[in-house]
Structure formats: structure tokens, C-alpha cells
Curated annotation (Swiss-Prot):
HAMAP family: F420_G6P_DH. The gene is fgd. The active site is at H41 (proton donor), E110 (proton acceptor). Belongs to the F420-dependent glucose-6-phosphate dehydrogenase family. It comes from Microbacterium testaceum (strain StLB037). The keyword Zinc does not apply. One of its GO terms (biological process) is carbohydrate metabolic process. This is F420-dependent glucose-6-phosphate dehydrogenase.
Length: 336
């Protein structure tokens, strides 16, 4: 199969409450976006002004208020707060209600969302193995009438998902390193990563790992949706476009700086110490729509087929209208 080129909207659940965020998701469909994704956080990156609506009821509400857009998580962790069997049931239900429109995006998680509940936070190798096992359980529950599974970390006994969609809900794996990227190539229907990092990370590590996983599974890039979350900040005034990124400064922290942080107040303290130039380093910051198009196009040229745009500002309606009217038509014309 050939993967179509799609352009989506990242709904900032760490920045907006559920009702306002829902209106943005509906507007994204009206403005011509192809998909709406959100993360599933128990706590936001920033304490002051932060939000953290749960993704699961929100996706159901968004599906009911839209007709066309793909809806999904980017990403959800099915290994600590949730048992994988519960996630299998939830997304099977969503798949029945909104056939062909639902994506389950999963990742290994962050301490921010797990430790506060008294849950353990193991080292990266165990988190990776937990994710593999969770995906196995979810797929078996979706495929089988009666499932018993005894794994290292999870088990199910005589389990049945009674309401399953005719069309399987695709699983996308979010990854920022080669191991999880390779796993996406081997077993997933989609791969998610984020923009604004060293270009060599994509060309020398991540995409070769994806291709290696695909090759081991006898697949090609045409068999997997490659999704890039593209961080963008547009405003006619450059200083304003730059300052908009301040709320999302935690994205500029390294994995070593933030992975073990479980408190939004501490995360905010670390982020506030960053100069604005570093806070903005993950974003395409520009006052020129043509520059946005040129810099976004580089990710298409790398082979990504699904670009999901995340704007850091508080005026999401302005962003959605500007991107829908100015950027998406230019991108579609360029890659027609």
C-alpha cells in the first residue's frame, strides 16, 4: 500500500482544558487538517497554567463532534497507570464507534505521569520490554476470542474483548531512540517521533533503525505511517513568535534532565532557567509562511508522510486558521 501525505494538529492537553481543547479539535477539521492527536498525561509539564485532561473520554467526545479526521494518542503509556487489557478494550470501543478513524499511539512513558501515583519507575530497558509485552497483549486481545497470556510483567486469563471493530485499530509506537524505532518497524502500523533535533539523529540513527525493523519483518516504508510531530511557532512579530515557546521550554530539556522528574513544579523550575533561545530550539520560529513551508518540507523529504503540527501559543484559533489557510494549501500544492 502507499501511505498518503497527511497533515494533522497536535492538541495541547498540557496547556488547555478539555472543553476548549475540544473546540480546537473541531476547528482543525473545519480548517482542513487530516488528523487530531493528543498526549495522555496525568500531570502537565508546567505547574502554572498547566492542564491534564484524560485522553480517553476526550477522544470519544472528539469523535462524536467530528466526521472525518483521524483521532488518536501521541502518545499514551499502556504499561503503568493502565493495564494493557484496559487499553485494548477502550480503543476497541473507539474503533467500533469511529471505524477507520482511530489510532493508538503508545510509548514507554515518563516519571511525571507515573511516580506521583506511587508506581515504580524502572530503568529504560525494562520500560521497553514492558511496552513490547503490552503491545503483544493488546494485539492478541483484538485478534482472539478468548485469550490467556502469562508474561513477565502482565497477564490476562480467559479474557475476551466483546466489542471489536471490523477494521483493526492501528498501533503507532512513539520513539526517540533506535531500539523503540526498530520495534516500530517490526511490529507497528505507525511510527511517531518529534522534530527540532539534530538532523543526523533522523538520517543516521532513527530512520536507519526503522528501515532495519521493517526489513526484519519483510516490510517497507509503504507499510508503515511515519508521523513527525512538527513544533512550529508563527506570529507576524518575531519576538512574539519566539516568546510563545516559553510555556513549552520543558521540551528543550534533555532526556537526562527531565526523565526522572515527577513533579510539575520541579519541571517548571528547570524549564524557567533556560534562556528563551534554548526554549525555542525545538520549534520552527518564523514570521514568514514561506519559511514555514520550506522548513516543514525537509521532513517530507526525509520520508515522513504524516506531519502533525504543534503550536505553543495560547491563541490556537489564530494558529489553526493561519495554518489552514496559508500553510496546508502550499504544502499540498508542493507535494501534489
Amino acid at each position: 500500500m502507499t501511505i498518503p501525505l497527511r497533515f494533522g494538529y497536535k492538541a495541547s492537553s498540557e496547556q488547555f482544558g478539555p472543553n476548549e481543547l475540544l473546540d480546537f479539535g473541531v476547528l482543525a477539521e473545519e480548517m482542513g487538517f487530516d488528523s487530531v492527536f493528543l498526549s495522555d498525561h496525568l500531570q502537565p509539564w508546567m505547574h502554572d497554567g498547566g492542564h491534564a485532561p484524560n485522553a480517553l473520554p476526550w477522544l470519544g467526545a472528539l469523535g462524536a463532534r467530528t466526521e472525518r479526521v483521524i483521532i488518536g494518542t501521541s502518545v499514551l503509556t499502556p504499561t503503568f497507570r493502565y493495564h494493557p487489557g484496559v487499553i485494548a478494550q477502550v480503543f476497541a470501543t473507539l474503533g467500533v464507534m469511529y471505524p477507520g478513524r482511530v489510532v493508538l499511539g503508545v510509548g514507554t512513558g515518563e516519571a511525571l505521569n507515573e511516580v506521583t501515583l506511587g508506581l515504580e519507575w524502572p530503568e529504560a530497558p525494562e520500560r521497553f520490554q514492558r511496552l513490547k509485552e503490552a503491545i503483544t497483549i493488546i494485539n492478541e486481545l483484538w485478534a482472539g476470542e478468548r485469550v490467556t497470556y502469562e508474561g513477565t510483567y502482565y497477564s490476562v486469563k480467559d479474557a475476551t474483548i466483546y466489542d471489536r471493530p471490523e477494521q483493526k485499530v492501528p498501533i503507532y509506537i512513539g520513539a526517540s531512540g533506535p531500539a523503540a524505532t526498530r520495534l516500530a518497524g517490526r511490529i507497528a502500523e505507525g511510527y511517531i517521533t518529534t522534530s527540532g533535533k539534530d538532523p543526523e539523529l533522523y538520517t543516521e540513527k532513527l530512520l536507519p533503525a526503522l528501515d532495519d525493523g521493517l526489513s526484519k519483518a519483510g516490510r517497507t516504508r509503504d507499510d508503515v505511517d511515519t508521523l513527525m510531530e512538527v513544533k512550529v511557532s508563527y506570529h507576524p512579530d518575531h519576538d512574539t513568535a519566539l516568546e510563545k515557546t516559553r510555556f513549552w521550554a520543558p521540551l528543550a530539556l534533555t532526556a537526562e534532565e527531565k526523565m526522572s522528574v515527577h513533579d510539575p513544579i520541579e519541571m517548571q523550575r528547570l524549564a524557567n532557567e533556560l534562556p528563551i533561545e534554548r526554549a525555542a530550539s525545538r520549534f520552527i520560529v518564523s514570521t514568514d509562511p514561506d519559511e514555514h513551508v520550506e522548513r516543514i518540507a525537509r521532513y517530507v523529504d526525509l520520508g515522513f508522510r504524516h506531519l502533525v503540527f504543534h503550536d505553543p501559543g495560547h491563541d490556537q484559533e489564530q494558529f489553526l486558521r493561519m495554518y489552514g489557510e496559508e500553510i496546508l494549501p502550499r504544502l499540498r500544492k508542493r507535494f501534489a
